[in-house]
């Protein structure tokens, strides 16, 4: 029963990793862009939530009503005003620009908030638990977190295949020139994709800030977790991203149970093993 609890906790933390990864998977699937600043944008969302909770006196989950649209607007403006100019056959310019953006965000947050760790307080929901079996209890907040992750992935999947915006994403991803001939403004489509990506980032950032301490320097580690979940699941696959996050979470939970120092190492080992056996990931949708 102890190992059942370990695996269950790994599944639940995997939901957070899936939210880290969903935005990466989305923008890579639409515009083949790898956003090096993705982890720092997660941290930025956490700090925006901190500002909202302190200024308005609301709880972190309620702050999502403001943090999500703010991050979406930042994503749209960032893509439309800067990143669209870097897209092309060469993958290096967007990598360099987003790397520079990562440094700017980290140093900006460091100047504004110092290097001190912060944490969002969500109240009684943090300590509320539900009994699964006689010896297994699950926190309400991790359950909510996982449910939100599943809903986010399902929502993105439905948007991609059942809406006009999703058809625009797929058309632009397949062939930009043909999409433009069809009357699509690819710059707007890419900006909408980034806005949607950062909306998911906002949710991930708030849940991260409730779950653990955060500071301006933790972004790169979140990027690695998200990247590993994307690669495990398969590039461009939303449900694969969820599966990748869960596999990564379970791996880390089992590693931590064996030895606390093995938590991160176990996740990296599983990532490398899957990459060696199945380089395209478990459920790939993007090739070439």
Can you say where each PLM-predicted feature lies in the sequence?
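Helix-loop-helix "hairpin" substructures at the membrane interface of multi-pass membrane proteins
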Residues: 13, 135-214, 238-244
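Membrane-interfacial amphipathic/re-entrant helices at transmembrane-helix boundaries
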Residues: 1-19, 48, 58-64, 89-95, ...
